């Protein structure tokens, strides 16, 4: 559909569609340790989904589409959560820096993301075009239903 952007479609459906596109293309460089790692220090277990790296890459690309100039630190804040401390009160805990860094590096390898001169990363015009194209496909699929 012409004129459809990432902001116009359901974010969950868009992230699923983009993750499927990244997996199907086979160009995203996935580290070999993805099946043994936790995504944050406040998590107790590793993720159940074996394709979590593609989902995280799609979610990160969407975040960079909506607000560019985000770096590793801001990605750890976005993917942070509640650290449970047993009988003591819970506090906020950031996500994994290593996972955020590797996801951004993998997206850079696809030429979807580039380093911003003001700090952080931003979407390239090619990356923005890919995301808008997938958003159009998601909108067209929703219109059929």
From Swiss-Prot:
Record's subunit section: Component of the small ribosomal subunit. Part of the small subunit (SSU) processome, composed of more than 70 proteins and the RNA chaperone small nucleolar RNA (snoRNA) U3. Interacts with RPS19BP1.
Location of N6-acetyllysine modifications: 23, 111, 115
Coiled coil residues, start to end: none
Keywords of this entry: Acetylation, Cytoplasm, Methylation, Nucleus, Ribonucleoprotein, Ribosomal protein
Single annotated GO MF: identical protein binding
Name of the featured protein: Small ribosomal subunit protein eS19
SUPFAM superfamilies, sorted: Winged helix' DNA-binding domain
Main location: cytoplasm
A Pfam family reported for this protein in Swiss-Prot or TrEMBL: Ribosomal_S19e
Sites bearing N6-succinyllysine, chain numbering: 143
Keyword Acetylation: yes
Family designation: Belongs to the eukaryotic ribosomal protein eS19 family.
Modified residues (Omega-N-methylarginine): 67
Cellular localization per UniProt: Cytoplasm; Nucleus, Nucleolus
GO cellular component terms, A-Z: cytoplasm; cytosol; cytosolic ribosome; cytosolic small ribosomal subunit; nucleolus; postsynaptic density; ribosome; small ribosomal subunit
Gene Ontology annotations of biological process type: antimicrobial humoral immune response mediated by antimicrobial peptide; erythrocyte differentiation; maturation of SSU-rRNA; maturation of SSU-rRNA from tricistronic rRNA transcript (SSU-rRNA, 5.8S rRNA, LSU-rRNA); monocyte chemotaxis; negative regulation of respiratory burst involved in inflammatory response; Notch signaling pathway; nucleolus organization
Gene3D superfamilies: Winged helix-like DNA-binding domain superfamily/Winged helix DNA-binding domain
Matches recorded under SMART domains: Ribosomal_S19e
Its job: Component of the small ribosomal subunit. The ribosome is a large ribonucleoprotein complex responsible for the synthesis of proteins in the cell. Required for pre-rRNA processing and maturation of 40S ribosomal subunits. Part of the small subunit (SSU) processome, first precursor of the small eukaryotic ribosomal subunit.
């Amino acid at each position: 559909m012409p004129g459809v952007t990432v902001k116009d479609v359901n974010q969950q459906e868009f992230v699923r569609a983009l993750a499927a596109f990244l997996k199907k293309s086979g160009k995203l460089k996935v580290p070999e340790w993805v099946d043994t790692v936790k995504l944050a220090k406040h998590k107790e277990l590793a993720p159940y989904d074996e394709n979590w790296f593609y989902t995280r890459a799609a979610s990160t690309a969407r975040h960079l589409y909506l607000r560019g100039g985000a770096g590793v630190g801001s990605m750890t804040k976005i993917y942070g959560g509640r650290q449970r401390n047993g009988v003591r009160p819970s506090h906020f805990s950031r996500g994994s820096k290593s996972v955020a860094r590797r996801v951004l590096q993998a997206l850079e390898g696809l030429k979807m993301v580039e380093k911003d001169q003001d700090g952080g990363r931003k979407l390239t015009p090619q990356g923005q075009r890919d995301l808008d194209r997938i958003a159009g496909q998601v909108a067209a699929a929703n219109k059929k239903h």
